[in-house]
Amino acid sequence: MATLSFRNVKKTYAGNVPVIHGIDMDVADGEFIVIVGPSGCGKSTLMRMVAGLETVTEGEILIDDKVVNTLEPAERDIAMVFQNYALYPHMSVFDNMAYGLKIRRLPKDEIRKRVEAAAQILELGKLLDRRPRALSGGQRQRVAMGRAIVREPKVFLFDEPLSNLDAKLRVAMRLEILKLHRRLNTTSLYVTHDQVEAMTLAHRMVVMYQGVPEQIGTPMEVFEKPASTFVAGFIGSPPMNLLEVAVGGDGIVHTSDGIALDISPLAVPQQVRGRKVVMGLRPEHMLLNAQGLAAEIEMVETLGSEQLVHGRCGKHMVVVRCSTRQFSETPARVGDTLTIGPDGRHPLHWFEADTGRRVEGL
């Protein structure tokens, strides 16, 4: 196990194209960090710099307080699990898991001991003689994880390891990875674009956007107190409703196209009064037929126990997440107009109109 640190790490490609704009972060011994963000945000580039597959343009990466910028990948004592498994098709499961240890010239008895121990952890004991073509997608991914485990590295790197699996297998493998980390407690860096993976796996998550860490925090910190409109719109399904509003000195709120919101001034903090800001409301923290604003229903998504009600209020689209029972008690249908508003139990979110950052102190 080890600590992992980033000191003003930057990456620029040829032509002076910046990809990573400067990251400072400390990962504690045994911590599971998930880097999440949309395609092109720099998350995989950051992972590859830790692995030694990309050079660091500026700054330092440290493993156990030792700068590793100039070390070869094999010298960093890390193990990486890829999206596409990267198994040798002509080798058995045992040989795939043992290959890296053979390259390092470990004794045969030690190799067998490590492979069998990893196989027991991952429930691969009966599959050691099979070739990859005889395995399911989930089994292949477990073999890839087993190959990483036997190295007994200081740091695990996971590069979107579940992206090739179907929805059911992804759930199962998330649980496998959780159990694996609790058992081994190895420092881990995990890259994904899937917010569900980030929320369920991470001790802390790093939300990346355009090469910049928008927010670093525990999953619930990021969900309950997003640092920017980007984070608010990226974390949460459906994402947070964001309305451009003008707030009067008396706490009365109007949308940017002049529609009044029937919201108690008591819910409007002093920091945003007399200003133009962005107001955020989580879909699950809103109610149908509640004080707020009138919206025309444009679409209803049925998810079994829940309904997603999409409504238009002027130029803004708003989504309400409600139970099927609550929706069945509401006579409104597509094309009808009804009032929707905050449930009063959860605070509203407020962001700066120009920067998108959360209003300070809220």
UniProtKB/Swiss-Prot annotation:
Keywords: ATP-binding, Cell inner membrane, Cell membrane, Membrane, Nucleotide-binding, Sugar transport, Translocase, Transport. SMART domains: AAA. GO terms for molecular function: ABC-type glycerol-3-phosphate transporter activity; ATP binding; ATP hydrolysis activity. One of its GO terms (cellular component) is ATP-binding cassette (ABC) transporter complex, substrate-binding subunit-containing. It holds the Pfam family OB_MalK. GO terms for biological process: carbohydrate transport; glycerophosphodiester transmembrane transport. Its EC number is 7.6.2.10. It comes from the Bacteria. Residues 4-235 form the ABC transporter domain. ATP binds at G37, P38, S39, G40, C41, G42, K43, S44. It catalyses: sn-glycerol 3-phosphate(out) + ATP + H2O = sn-glycerol 3-phosphate(in) + ADP + phosphate + H(+). Its main location: membrane. It is a peripheral membrane protein. It is found in: Cell inner membrane. InterPro entries: AAA+_ATPase, ABC_transporter-like_ATP-bd, ABC_transporter-like_CS, ABC_transpr_MalK-like, ABC_transpr_MalK/UgpC-like, Mo/tungstate-bd_C_term_dom, NA-bd_OB-fold, OB_MalK-like. Belongs to the ABC transporter superfamily. sn-glycerol-3-phosphate importer (TC 3.A.1.1.3) family. Part of the ABC transporter complex UgpBAEC involved in sn-glycerol-3-phosphate (G3P) import. Responsible for energy coupling to the transport system. The complex is composed of two ATP-binding proteins (UgpC), two transmembrane proteins (UgpA and UgpE) and a solute-binding protein (UgpB). PANTHER family: MALTODEXTRIN IMPORT ATP-BINDING PROTEIN MSMX (PTHR43875), SN-GLYCEROL-3-PHOSPHATE IMPORT ATP-BINDING PROTEIN UGPC (PTHR43875:SF12). This is sn-glycerol-3-phosphate import ATP-binding protein UgpC. The gene is ugpC.
